[in-house]
């Protein structure tokens, strides 16, 4: 395992924090890695427009003792909620974090964080949709950075980890397989295609199949307590003690070069999408893309991720102002 205790990896996280609870789990894992000095979280971009997602990120940051972390959101903002509404529910646990008066555009947060980072140092983790990242590429120079977006990314981002797509046998139409779509790719096909085709540098992908059997979060009520916002999010989304596949959590773990010996990488190649967002993979020696493959058991990988997901905050800030029963009653 790579030792980052003296050189934590600077990471920027792009998340939807809305439709599926693995986004909340991924932020929890990122904070646990930060507590170990494996990573240093520079900021968070919300790539959906519902302001409850923004406030939920702030609740989680505060719960883990980092209320100062900048959080941006896709503009214009809305009152939209996800189908299970966990973001609004955990926001109401901490009303001071739920006020929508501090919601800068995500592109501004991303640009400022990159501008302040050392050249070639940042790992960008995308666990949602691609609108903010495409907007970042298109962004002009401004007061935070003299470089336009594409040049800023090229100068500052050393590595990009993306949860998205479906790989392996299903992504090889030349071998007779029928390609399939995946949620993050299908959300906006045009933006997905632009991101895949225009993003500077290499991209490491965590495909749907990589983590579909890696179930985590079942023990959160025991490891963090019933009133943890992470445990509540999982209970509201999937049911208490049920757990959820670890798509986004696995991407965050790989951003810190964790899971050594449990994950292997494909040959290099190029990822694209067709007009209905089905994943198209072309192996190529000079390609900038590759995808992760689990080479140990799903249970072993889940145990390692659960160890991080279930860790209580090292230095929590403030108190939670509602119990799990009250939050469930609101939902």
Locate each region found by the language model.
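N-terminal acidic, glycine/proline-rich low-complexity segments
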Residues: 1-331
